[in-house]
């Protein structure tokens, strides 16, 4: 949220795994602009059906249950609401929700805040109009304080919108301190270790001192972490975070998923994209990239 509200940052790019708060981040941005900094907003989902589902299942409950937002957006069923599932008006602004495959939804009124969710699932072109992200971006051209937010799990190397955007950013990674030696480090799958055929023994091993972190220890370390940029800032803030940081997924479950996924390239590809938040390269020896030291 600090990056979203920073006037020096033009674009925010979030390349992330599952269960690390991507959707909550988007909801927080919407809530902030509904309650504190009213603006016209556009939320782009891969399809209209996904936009409707996001509105009903996530956005509407937040607007209804958050005290500071309650009442700012009228119930669509009210006679004077002027609201629908995919278009909600509030004092000083509105939020529209569209599918990336809809040229008309991407080419109407000016928008200051553009939120593009799961951009790697967008089609190459919205009808015959061109790239959906660029169409949405053009909607914000008249605002000096515009903000473009792109969020996604990645897909294939060379064809991933989110990876390409991340490569143009300042490439921020989340560094956590070891609870024992305090060395700050990115969490890597190569440092997840377990006894052979015993996923329940999985732990994270500090790259500096070798101490083993169980899940509670890992959760505490993550809470003390901080983002660090690894490249020059040129107006685009990029964030990468994998499922290893998630407090919702025990490492034992992650190891079980990995052991099951590595049996076939297609399932390993999905695991790589969704858990590690990394793009997939079609290589016959891809499984070798995940060689993990197993402790006896």
Regions found by a protein language model. Give the residues of each.
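Phosphate/NTP-binding elements of NTP-utilizing enzymes
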Residues: 1-296
């Amino acid at each position: 949220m600090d990056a979203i509200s920073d006037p020096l940052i033009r674009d925010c790019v979030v390349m992330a795994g599952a269960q690390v708060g991507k959707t909550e981040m988007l909801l927080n941005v919407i809530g902030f602009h509904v309650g504190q900094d009213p603006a016209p907003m556009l939320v782009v989902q891969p399809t209209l059906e996904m936009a409707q589902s996001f509105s009903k299942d996530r956005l509407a409950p937040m607007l209804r249950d958050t005290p500071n937002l309650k009442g700012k957006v009228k119930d669509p069923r009210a006679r004077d609401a002027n609201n629908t599932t995919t278009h909600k008006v509030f004092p000083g602004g509105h939020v529209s929700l569209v599918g990336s495959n809809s040229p008309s939804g991407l080419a109407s009124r000016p928008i200051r805040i553009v939120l593009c969710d799961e951009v790697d699932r967008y089609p190459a072109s919205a009808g015959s109009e061109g790239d959906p992200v660029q169409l949405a971006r053009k909607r914000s051209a008249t605002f000096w304080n515009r903000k473009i937010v792109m969020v996604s799990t990645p897909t294939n190397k060379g064809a991933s919108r989110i990876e390409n955007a991340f490569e143009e950013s300042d490439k921020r990674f989340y560094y956590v301190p070891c609870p024992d030696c305090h060395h700050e480090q990115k969490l890597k799958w190569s440092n997840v270790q377990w006894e052979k055929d015993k996923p329940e023994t999985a732990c994270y091993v500090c790259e500096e001192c070798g101490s083993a972190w169980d899940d509670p220890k890992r959760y505490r370390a993550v809470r003390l972490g901080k983002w660090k940029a690894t490249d020059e800032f040129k107006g685009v803030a990029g964030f990468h975070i994998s499922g290893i940081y998630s407090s919702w997924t025990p490492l034992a479950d992650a190891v079980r998923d990995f052991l099951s996924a590595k049996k076939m390239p297609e399932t390993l590809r999905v695991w790589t994209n969704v858990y590690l938040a990394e793009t997939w390269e079609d290589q016959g020896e891809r499984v070798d990239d995940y060689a993990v030291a197993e402790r006896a």
